[in-house]
Amino acid sequence: EYGATAAMFFIDDNTLDYLRLTGREDTQVALVETYAKAAGLWADALASAEYVRTLHFDLSSVVRNMAGPSNPHRRVATADLAANGIAGPWAMPDAGTMPDGAVVIAAITSCTNTSNPRNVIAAGLLARNARRRGLTRKPWVKSSLAPGSKAVQLYLEESGLLPDLEQLGFGIVAFACTTCNGMSGALDPAIQQEIIDRDLYATAVLSGNRNFDGRIHPYAKQAFLASPPLVIAYAIAGTVRFDIEKDVLGIDHDGNAVTLKDLWPSDEEIDAVVKASVKPEQFRAVYGPMFKLHVDTGERVAPLYAWREMSTYIRRPPYWEGALAGARTLTGMRPLAVLGDNITTDHLSPSNAIMADSAAGEYLAKMGVPEEDFNSYATHRGDHLTAQRATFANPKLVNEMAIVDGTVRQGSLARIEPDGRVVRMWEAIETYMERRQPLIIVAGADYGQGSSRDWAAKGVRLAGVEAIVAEGFERIHRTNLIGMGVLPLEFQPGVTRLT
């Protein structure tokens, strides 16, 4: 998540305890210890290691944090939400309406966060405490729990915390990638319409890894990353304008005000439940069958895939045909987009829900796909005709060429040249494809950060982009561009798109 190829951590007794907890055999744990000590990876052996740079970090300074909006590295302590302009005074809405900053999606999700039993148990204990005090989530919050492992369900059942989570709306919906990859599913139509009618600042709070604009849901204007227990707290609060450390979450059965500190479990409580409820046999029951070999002697299949020409999920890609297989001219290129800093792969090829009025939605409708089966861009990436229409389809895109009435307009827009017309991005791409016009993209720093999404490179190549000039590229995306035959070029130091 921070751009490194690998991170090395020393091995100690805590590592071995985790291996035992997650069902590893004693012989394997002993082998890890023996190897680590022999290879110089054991904690004691690294005490005298010399490093190019040493950072000193005071663990006692760690407080509750969130990340957002818009970037995973935009950390903010929950105690500083008001100072950062996120939390603040907000008018109580009329009965039946949502407040400013409404949390419309609250999701405990992502294989990263749910692989830590302490995080999940902490969420369950907070849910239990909230339930006992008579608190529940706000009615406009779509909530879910999507663990990365089936072992999570087993230890939540063992601890008796699953019913408490379910009561607050955090029942298990899948063991899969869901909200964190833009696949939360549809909002309640009435809630979605209210967001549109009131131009409401609606948000998502999730325990995922990335929160780039437009990634989580088209109608969640921004998203915040939080720990699983904080996700539940925000589902109860119902808005990010809420000062989660100070404001009153609700009134209990006895008329007492309830704040976050009244619900937050202590480390001792969490450790006790983990010790009693998280067991090695749960992990063995889930993962053991994966390693039992089974030879399938059933029906033989052809060695080559039988392509279905009309499929909207997977069809034969054209990367080795026609213009895509020809030599690049690198001459006479017109700019498809001029972009700023921090363009993510979610800007380049979003993975979230396909809206009916999008280019991909209109294409799927023409192919006879009902709107309820549009699903997400991620599920249709095997069909290049759908995925092409996802290129730069993020509604939060800011193409500096898309100037309307003297100002740059946000959206999936481009300006066709030499016509000077500002149109939807796909219309511009389609026009340039018909003209066989080679294209170039100009951008700022950190181009291509975020998920290592190959379609972020495939899409621009299919659009006819031959080169991208930027102040800097994310390493994996740069490699993907080269693999697709798109030339990544960097400005000389001190030179930008604006100089």
Go through the PLM ranges and name each one.
Residues 54-160, 164, 296-467:
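Non-catalytic terminal/interface segments that mediate subunit docking, oligomerization
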Residues 6, 14-19, 63-66, 111-117, ...:
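Flexible loop/turn segments at secondary-structure boundaries
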